């Protein structure tokens, strides 16, 4: 459901963190808002915006955040077991378009992070172009950053859930 990571983060912090959930979709934010009310969570504020233009929208966001979760739009290849028809909409061109957007999001969002902060990049895909290869290229291009850790989960008999990827990135000390 839209916003499940935001509500989970609010619950993990006992509803005490300042969480700003950003999405371009008013419909998704409305669902999130409904879930926040149902769960009585007050620490999550929603912002309808294109995440690639947050600095232009609010310059105070520069070096503002301690932690950022970038749950990037992706091909969703890791969810094919739940969404088998989505395979018919996949193409090399679509993956290329998504990687360009993912890279733009990383470039746009990293300046919002405090110098001692941490960014978590996550996708629900198992496509290396959208995951480790993208992150390696991004860090190679941005010499002030370092990869703290990364994990690729592949669906299997031992793990029947979705495939996904996450990377933790921070500034070098």
What is the predicted function of each stretch?
Residues 1-173:
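S-adenosylmethionine
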């Amino acid at each position: 459901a839209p916003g499940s990571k935001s509500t989970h983060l609010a619950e993990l912090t006992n509803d005490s963190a300042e969480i700003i959930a950003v999405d371009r979709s008013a419909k998704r934010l409305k669902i999130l808002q409904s879930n926040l009310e149902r769960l009585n969570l007050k620490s999550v504020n929603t912002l309808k915006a294109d995440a690639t233009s947050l600095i232009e929208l609010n310059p105070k966001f520069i070096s503002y955040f301690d932690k950022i979760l970038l749950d990037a739009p992706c091909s969703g290849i890791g969810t094919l077991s739940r969404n088998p028809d989505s395979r018919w909409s996949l193409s090399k061109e679509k993956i290329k378009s998504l990687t360009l957007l993912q890279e733009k999001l990383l470039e746009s969002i990293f300046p919002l992070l405090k110098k001692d902060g941490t960014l978590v990049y996550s996708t629900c895909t198992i496509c290396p172009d959208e995951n480790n290869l993208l992150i390696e290229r991004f860090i190679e291009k941005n010499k002030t950053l370092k990869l703290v850790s990364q994990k690729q989960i592949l669906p299997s008999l031992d793990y029947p859930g979705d495939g996904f990827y996450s990377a933790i990135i921070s500034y070098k000390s």
